[in-house]
Amino acid sequence: MTHNQELIETIIADQVHQELHSIQDFLRWTYSTFNRSDIYYGHGYNNAWDEALQLILTTLALPIDFPNEYYAAHLTRSEKEVLLRLIIQRLEKRIPVAYLTHQAWFCGLNFYVDERVIVPRSPISALIQEGFAPLLPQEPKRILDMCTGSGCIAIACAERFPEAEVDAVDLSSDALDVAQINIERHNMLDRVYPIQSDLFHDLAKDQYDLIVANPPYVDLEDLSDMPAEFHHEPEMALGSGVDGLEITKKILYAAPDYLTEQGVLVCEVGNSMVHLIEQYPDVPFNWVELKNGGVGVFALTQAELMQYRHLFQ
């Protein structure tokens, strides 16, 4: 029996729902329970408190900034039962909270998510909020979000640059269905356009001022060692060959044909940055310092991509 299974048996045996009455009771108890468990935090939240807060308030249809003075409000029996069922799922099946609530936050915006897409967590969010300064010479009018998934990066870019149009590309029709939900939720039907394509294969020869790419980049070794929570995400959105760079190299090779002369590619490769640096020591990757933490995001100009293109064949 695993440690989490022991916790679940204790929850059932103690008939917790009879002793917990208020929002505050459930927050404290859930926080303690998560702290005692061996669940992994890394899908939008990095600690037990934030996960407990998100799970409970979202499930109760309450805002995350719900006033503390109302935390003493009592819950109905049915609300308690729903919360306990979700908490047990989090412990037993190691399902990320975002999939349990179907809600995730990115750049201060709320997105619908389910297991057809990975949970939004890209450190590129910091660059979006800063308007990609100082990487861009001017505000972009045309943006391409490659490997869009839930559409969070595309929509956040459209919010940050009100005059821009954004193409949101993904190979997965399932992912694009989720992106469409979010495009409609954020009233972006006339500015964010979902496109099914194997990278650039089915795109018109448009030119973009900015290409943002968050492709699969987990290498084979890391993929096999990932915590159970990651196995609920679509594998095609995580792994990318032995070195994690199979898809990134294709993007690097094709991107200059789709960028304006002043255009910039911003791409996330996470821990696979080590392999990228080793394989291409002569390429002047601009590894961006991210104010919210995180590593593995680089920028290259159209001219740089064209100059070193022969290396990515």
UniProtKB/Swiss-Prot annotation:
Stored SUPFAM superfamilies: S-adenosyl-L-methionine-dependent methyltransferases (SSF53335)
Keywords noted in UniProt: Methyltransferase, S-adenosyl-L-methionine, Transferase
Enzyme Commission number: 2.1.1.298
Catalytic activity from the UniProt record: L-glutaminyl-[ribosomal protein uL3] + S-adenosyl-L-methionine = N(5)-methyl-L-glutaminyl-[ribosomal protein uL3] + S-adenosyl-L-homocysteine + H(+)
Pfam hit, one: MTS
InterPro entries noted in UniProt: DNA_methylase_N6_adenine_CS, HemK-like, Ribosome_uL3_MTase, SAM-dependent_MTases_sf, Small_mtfrase_dom
Keyword Transferase among record annotations: yes
A single Gene Ontology CC term: cytosol
Transmembrane segments annotated in the record for this chain: none
Any GO MF annotation of the entry: protein-glutamine N-methyltransferase activity
Protein's job: Methylates large ribosomal subunit protein uL3 on a specific glutamine residue.
The protein's name: Ribosomal protein uL3 glutamine methyltransferase
Species: Pasteurella multocida (strain Pm70)
Phylogenetic lineage: Bacteria, Pseudomonadati, Pseudomonadota, Gammaproteobacteria, Pasteurellales
Gene that this sequence comes from: prmB
